[in-house]
């Protein structure tokens, strides 16, 4: 067994008032290393099925390779503090109070232990007491909530599949083998241009608050297009950059749709690194919700100026046909500029530690609750259609905010995302809040938050977060985005058959099923 740190935990007390029973950390370590069930752990093991016992052993063996600086910085953010506070109702200190501070200390110390690193067992070893108390009543409630959510999700996914089949039965029969395969690149060659615009406005950046800032933008333009191209502005996710999902920008451009991908410097990869280096006090500033949408509005302003003064740009872009697209936090941004109103009342109601489980979605949305009422409307009327993948919406918009969107809207959801933006809370239920008649919900089953991400960006994520066959998800996203923007920016009704369940059934793959619906009952 490993050497114990000073003041190491010796046992875990499971409390189910008035009954208590005990398991030593040594017994858990023997089980993790050798698979042997000994001592007090036997009373727990006999109640578990073989697959559950194997899962427990796998969790105990799991090691996360993150530096103690990164772990420490993350643990002091509002986002992570809310999550730890919730777990602290289950894992208590030796004084039977919320285990928040003890858990945070133990996780940081375990990460700093170069020999053993950040493992569940090592976190237990570094707990700052002789005893860890587990409140089984709270744990039971916790697992009931999680189980209920999973069952509700599965029931909802099945209901959506049935609704999709009902819709398919009413749709005209189309032989898609005779139509272009939208998963394949289009006929246009793609030109990439990078430009930097100086924006004279205040904004949080990785170096602090700036009174003006550079807005870096990559453009993906169809070459030698016989007509002006519609424009889609793509918003990247939190902690990423404008290169993420470049594949879909190139794909759209090959089909004659110009794409601009701005860099949101207050929530990009560089900002995230600055935070973990200690240069920023928190993982995001509340004003970033406003600044991201402003980036897109400023970009459209600059492009209008270019089109009016530069013959090259005038010959390329039709700024009467503008759409927005985004993934994750970028999807949240895209919905804001499309008309979703930030819902301060909903944020103040929902931003409590007891209103979420494992997801980071609500804590991230809760940063917006300190915005002022005059910062809640970010709509740009030049935007004619919005395509949002895995957006975070439940609290920041709610039914009142989502109901403000009046333009065509496509929402993409990964059904088995339990970590970043749960499908039921952030996509499926919000889809029912939309009042626009031109709305679509595309469901990737059993997809995750990363079901259409490029492999190089998700290689280090655990398999349950990556999900099955992201390559298939990327093909779905490519095809659906082309069809959606051709219909709703260019009025190409010959692309409309691609936006229904009949087409979804044609391209759907067993490892990652695709369902598309146009309506759902609330």
What is each residue range found by the language model?
Residues 419-426:
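Conserved alpha/beta-hydrolase "acid-adjacent" motif
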Residues 21, 32-176:
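Mature extracellular/secreted ectodomains of secretory-pathway proteins
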């Amino acid at each position: 067994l490993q050497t114990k740190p000073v003041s190491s935990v010796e046992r875990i007390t499971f409390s189910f008032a008035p009954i208590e029973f005990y398991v030593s950390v040594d017994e858990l370590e023997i089980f993790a290393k050798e698979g042997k069930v000994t001592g007090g752990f036997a009373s727990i093991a006999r109640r578990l099925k073989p697959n559950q016992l194997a899962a427990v052993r796998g969790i105990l063996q799991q090691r996360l390779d993150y530096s103690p600086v990164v772990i420490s910085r993350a643990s002091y953010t509002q986002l992570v503090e809310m999550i730890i506070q919730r777990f602290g109702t289950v894992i208590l200190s030796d004084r039977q109070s919320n285990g928040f501070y003890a858990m945070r200390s133990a996780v940081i110390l375990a990460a700093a232990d170069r020999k053993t690193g950040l493992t569940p067992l090592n976190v237990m070893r570094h707990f700052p007491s002789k005893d860890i108390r587990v409140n089984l009543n709270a744990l039971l409630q916790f697992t009931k909530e999680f189980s209920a959510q999973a069952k509700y999700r599965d029931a909802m996914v099945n209901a959506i599949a049935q609704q999709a089949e009902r819709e398919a039965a009413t749709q005209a029969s189309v032989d898609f083998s005779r139509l272009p395969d939208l998963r394949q690149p289009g006929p246009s060659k793609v030109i990439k241009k990078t430009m930097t615009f100086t924006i004279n406005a205040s904004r949080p950046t990785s170096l602090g608050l700036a009174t003006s800032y550079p807005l870096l933008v990559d453009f993906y333009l169809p070459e030698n297009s016989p007509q002006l191209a519609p424009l889609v502005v793509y918003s990247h996710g939190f902690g990423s950059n404008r290169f993420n999902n470049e594949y879909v920008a190139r794909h759209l451009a090959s089909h004659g749709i110009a794409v601009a991908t701005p860099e949101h410097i207050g929530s990009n990869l560089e900002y995230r690194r600055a935070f973990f280096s200690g240069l920023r006090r928190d993982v995001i500033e509340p004003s970033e919700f406003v600044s991201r949408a402003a980036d897109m509005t400023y970009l459209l302003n600059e492009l209008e100026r270019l089109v009016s003064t530069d013959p090259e740009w005038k010959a390329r872009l039709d700024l009467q046909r503008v759409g927005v697209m985004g993934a994750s936090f970028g999807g949240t941004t895209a919905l804001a500029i499309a008309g979703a109103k930030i819902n301060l009342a909903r944020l103040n109601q929902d931003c409590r530690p007891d209103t979420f489980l494992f997801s980071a979605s609500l804590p991230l949305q809760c940063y917006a609750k300190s915005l002022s009422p005059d910062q809640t409307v970010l709509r740009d009327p030049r935007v004619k259609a919005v395509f949002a993948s895995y957006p975070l919406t439940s609290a920041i918009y709610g039914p009142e905010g989502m109901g403000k969107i009046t333009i065509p809207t496509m929402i993409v959801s990964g059904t088995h995302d339990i970590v970043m933006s749960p499908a039921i809370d952030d996509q499926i239920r919000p889809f029912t809040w939309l009042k626009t008649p031109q709305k679509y919900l595309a469901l990737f089953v059993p997809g995750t938050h990363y079901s259409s991400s490029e492999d190089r960006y998700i290689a280090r994520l655990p398999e349950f977060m990556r999900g099955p066959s992201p390559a298939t998800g990327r093909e779905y996203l490519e095809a659906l985005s082309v069809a959606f923007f051709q219909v709703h920016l260019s009025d190409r009704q010959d692309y409309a058959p691609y936006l229904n369940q009949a087409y979804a059934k044609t391209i759907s793959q067993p490892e990652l099923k695709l369902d598309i619906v146009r309506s759902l009952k609330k």
